[in-house]
Amino acid sequence: YEPISWDSAFGIIAEQLSELDNPDEAIFYTSGRTSNEAAFLWQLLARRLGTNNLPDCSNMCHESSGVALGDSIGIGKGTVKLEDFSKADLILVVGQNPGSNHPRMLSALKAAKVAGASVVSINPLFETGMRRFKHPQDPLEVIGQGTTIADMHVPVNVNGDLALFRGLSKSIISGSGIDYNFISKYTSGYDEYERAVADSSWDEIVSASGVARHDIEKLAAAMRASSSTIVCWAMGLTQHHNSVATIQEIANTLLLGGHIGRPGAGLCPVRGHSNVQGDRTVGINHKPSRGFLDSLRNTTGIESPFNHGYDSVNSVLAMLDGRAKVFLSMGGNFVSAMSDTDSTSRAIQSCDLSVQISTKPNRSHLVTGKTALILPCLGRTERDVTSEGYQFVSVENSMGVVHSSQGSSKPASKHLKSEPAIVAGMAVALDGKIGDSGVSWSKLSVDYDSIRNLIESAVPGFDSYNERVREPQGFYLPNPPRDDRCFNTDTGRANFRVHPITATSPDDGQFVMMTIRSHDQYNTTIYGLDDRYRGIKEARRVVMMCKEDMNRLGIKTGTLVDLTSHFEGDELTAHRWRVVEYDIPAGNIATYFPEANCLVPLNSVAEGSNTPTSKSVCVTVRTTEENMRFWNRTATQAA
């Protein structure tokens, strides 16, 4: 790399974009840390060019949640407010590790416990943060025993959750936990679902879930007794072939008891990035609705294409086969975050141009297109001062609260630009190549109130945006299922959706591998080699395996193994992983993300959401020594 001026960088980008044979040869990727203001301008720039190629990190994580809930309850978001936790009788935490990935949520769970709620952990791993919590800002807790969080742990098989919740529904329907008034007034499809549940055998449920019937019925009894139940989940549910079906099964179970649209109850997908939900709200969507595009045209004058664009997986495929030639990334570390690291790297390297808008160096700066640009931007913690004064941005959290974010630190360099200013600079340069868009990009780059005015006009729910976002706690966006028990679905009601019980079925000799994050890690950013809550030190290339499986394979803690994933006849191999004994169900193993992404097949995706199946990878395990002997024998025979 060598330094160039901002004008030169914007000129290179505009030149490449203007010379494309088709606007769909450009891809505009978005990281979930991008603010509402920058994200709105980013999608506006893409659609001004003429493409809906707007993949984002949600495609890799909670896309399954959005697809499932949009069809079931009419909104691709959760239905819970933060204050609902202290009003709940029962909280199920499924496929989630809040201790490491959502630490502030532990405070909400602690408050719920103090208020009398029961908390149940449903996870192949019983994570330390779910056992006991010491609030770091409470001196008495730090020196004391802390608060016990989980009253019960259910060690479900990897991808056994659909079967588990089918079992819960079966027990609830046979008991007394059904809110027939709610079902009659607000739902559709109950009779068909009831028949499907009746046809599901306990043998099938127990086999697929890995949970004994009496444990399922024990949890179901707690659900029947609960007046207000919350179910939380994260990527432990969203990255399987059947993730959409699994999340809809959870929705079915809550609909039975009417646990949507009342205090202390609801569905709660817990997202990781600070604004992954807000980015989607303001238009980062490769499958935009016609209504949104019409509203965007009426607000900005931009005529958007109506055809759907590429998501993250399809972006890689498009780059690999030459259908996409320019990759622009608003934040993030796409090469490390995506599945099938080798294929993703080759895809980026095939591009004529790759552009990274970043706050710090990452792997994606080293795996690049033929021409590569790094555009350094202000971080959220840095002061953003323009000719119009001190600016702030806004984000939306997992509960649907939009609030402001304003940096106070001195910028690392006087040459840094804000994300909105960078997008506007690219847009002005592009206008100079392909004609005036009619958008006042320069004004938008210095006055973020004017961006928020556009969002208010284009996106429902942002009335009086600039006034309300300045309130200390921000404001809630409308959520019809939560606020009014209004369900904007195809039936006008909340839908019971029926799916067969499915699970990941490895061949003989294979394991089901899930990828997880460590405590000293935030998404693809790794701060240290220790995973303190799991007792793993100075190592990340590890395989967590139960003692039973280790004994069966004749290996010990510390043994080096090679992992090979299998999908539709294709194999991906990664060498020299160190085995660690861990409490995980037999037949399942766990490895760290992003190191194990190289084993996640690119074409192995969730039905309906196209999310990589990073939690359901069928792998074989061979000792590295055994593999070396095998290859030596093969080479000798060939000679």
Question: What annotation goes with each model-predicted range?
Answer:
Residues 1-275, 282, 296-482, 492, ...:
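Cofactor-pocket helix-loop regions in the catalytic cores of large enzyme subunits
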Residues 468-547, 551-608, 616, 621-639:
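Long, compositionally biased stretches
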Residues 283-288:
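Flexible, surface-exposed loop regions and adjacent strand-edge segments
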